[in-house]
Amino acid sequence: MDDIQKEAVHPLEAMGISGEVVQAFNWMGFHNLTAIQEKCIPLMMDGHDIIAIAPTGTGKTLGFGIPMLEYVNLDDSSVQEVVLAPTRELAQQIADELTNLAHFIKGVKIAVIYGGQPFGKQMSALNRKPQVLVATPGRLLDHMQRGKYSPRNGAYDGARRSG
């Protein structure tokens, strides 16, 4: 009998997810994938677009956030990924989760913009050249109309429906 025991491979590692993201996933207190994550992450890593509907609290944010962060090009300082959220509370919650998930990735920048925040604070966030932008539709449109943000380089990666 072999004295060497095989170490179990983390399910995210088996999907080709970077060590930094796996480390953050564990650091956030998660050790197992939820059903929505098991289904969505491999499809998104293979470049498929998905529409996923699942109850609150089932891990949707990490389900799209993990592949999203894997595709961020740290050498590109333009907005590469955009997440739209219907409310400021949800936008902030998503930004917080993505920030935690990116904790061990050096150089990734995430910004959140939504109504009710001072416009100057949001301009400062955009001027820091985030690769990931979380926004409410109205405030994103406001920045676009003022010429402060152009979606020409952004990718559409997530939608949330309230209710």
State the predicted function of each range.
Residues Q37, D49, K60, Q80, ...:
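Short, cationic motifs built from Arg/Lys/His that form the positively charged side of catalytic pockets
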Residues E38-I50, T61-D76, D96-A102, L141:
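Walker A/P-loop NTP-binding motif
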Residues A54-T58:
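The conserved Walker
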Residues D2-I53:
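Conserved pre-motif I regulatory segment
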Residues E7-H10, T61, K109, K121, ...:
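Residue-level signal for pocket-adjacent positions within structured domains
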Residues M44, Q122, G163:
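Short Asp/Glu-rich motifs
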Residues G19-F30, D76-K148, R152-Y156:
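Conserved nucleic-acid-binding Ia/Ib motif block in the N-terminal RecA-like helicase ATPase lobe
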